């Protein structure tokens, strides 16, 4: 390394060098007590083929190694190794390939590393990293957040040393702009903008969807300043996003080193594209998955299942999937002599001839979804040990404890009196092969999808086959579980020329590679819908697109704690938002969610939005392909589509479904306020044109969810709603268009990439259609239309109030 002259350090710390131990006090935003240390000044640096390395002296006289690696021209990796020590385990989520050598220069006060667009400036003394994008400062580390006594309120980038001298955590502290906002962190339900919040990423069985305890926390967030950060670890992470200081935020990992990626792009869509280009994008899911899923916990036998299918047909609803939770032998069956030993088999006493049942469902246009969890029942309340536990333990396929025996624990948060389970070890290749073979068997029978439930509660003292601990792999476990089941499903489905998906509860950074997800156990209450939407928006900004929630709410209790069906309005509002979400599954805990058990008003409201969704399937599927190509979520926060509008930065009560449709679900608000960004919008309920760039008060109607068509955009729709989705390209479409002057929009179907253009000028409307099977247009024009041309050929049209039919 090239050595750098030692600076006069004392001048930078006039009040701290004499009493450094005072740095320990008052740091409530850190999770560990101990001696804090931080990077002080550079002593040497060395150019690397893909970045630059630094030897840095710390405040307490130790040394640290800092490696900077560029992974694209606008993204880099920051690694800090205290005491110059390589860790026992680099517990990384991703190891992105380097993108080539930056230009590294030494200047009088700085070392700089530069790509075509990104420049990192490292101050020699005191250590400080500044990030510039296209010649302008984007962000920088915070090195001077002090109290009046000149003691640090937020300590600069550094680490904590325990009593035995080992490093027990590491942290980064960044400057926070006065108006900076933060989004993401996975499926966090409690707030949209995380400024001023504490966030911990540690998967838990949340048992609700209205707090920041979540099934799918992710150590990834996006800043309104034009960058995003992924803490590149599976270990528990903590984020103090300005909760204890209005000028700094801190990221902490319980690793003995620091490892994160920073992506730089002033366009929030660009940030998601950049992140998913490296971390992965979802493969396309089956077309039928965009239909309606019917479920309850649970249909208990084949006769009941087939009765529900018959009732759905009689009711006239459009539906494509039915789900069974309790399809396997009862848990008790594994505790009797000669009881069940293998996993994932039908209980043929309750579901006789499962192959015949699946074939019968297929003939009726219905796919089958089945529940699973990644545990085996170990010990029942009477202390008996299950046959499955013995079998899996004998094969060495269970996660162990410190004593080398299978680690037994309660499967849910706080379930101390529940049946005890042991976890399948997805780091063991033997177990992975076994589970894949069991899943492939089900897929080849014709099962459509597996619901991968649970996986969040592995204890920290667990020991895995690959040698990692519960601290290191607790967050990784849900991802390994999803990966195993998804890969098995995909491999089997590809043999049959079909697409695959999961219906997964838990996950982590990178979950978009194993679609899809649902929000977990949600309440039926109307105000809880807002929490669900917040979770959906946050996980979308974290790279996950194919997402839904339990329509009707998974649970609902009366004042005595008894389970009851939701009230009509609770059910209706949930149905409306759920059917205008990326994926739509109705599900409930023991009480029914079938629409016919509710009032006539609720039934009509259900059918109205159910049929509208099915008419919109070409739009939804095309938007799904946009996710696959670009990583942009289907359910989009308003700031994604309108990043330059400051009004959108904190809106979490509405969203864009794709780029054309604004959805403003009704919760429990006394008055329903909707923000319409710039342009003029078409109210799809009334056909009225409404000027934007303002808030409006929308009249609440029980059968209406406000939907608005964006200016200069279109929605491809089916003319009639089918009962089921066929596995073929959509045909005979109607394009619903809101045109002011000029627009161009892509359309995608399997193997089809079409383009639609519209130009309105001097009362002449020119429509250009390429590779879109359209037979009718419904045109909402902002001006007078006297002539219409389609692909340069004059076309007849009629006027019906607010729109033209062509």
Mark where each language-model region is.
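Catalytic core of carbohydrate-active enzymes
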Residues: 486-492, 500, 507-517, 539-549, ...
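Aromatic- and carboxylate-enriched substrate-binding clefts and catalytic-loop regions
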Residues: 81-83, 90-93, 134, 318-606, ...
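Beta-sheet entry/capping signal
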Residues: 75-76, 119, 128, 219-220, ...
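Short, hydrophobic/amphipathic alpha-helical packing segments
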Residues: 185, 195-198, 214, 305-306, ...
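Residues that flank catalytic or metal-binding motifs in active/ligand-binding sites
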Residues: 64, 109, 127, 216, ...
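C-terminal substrate/ligand-recognition segments
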Residues: 295-297, 305, 311-314, 320, ...
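N-terminal accessory segment at the very beginning of proteins
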Residues: 1-283, 287-288, 297, 302-310, ...
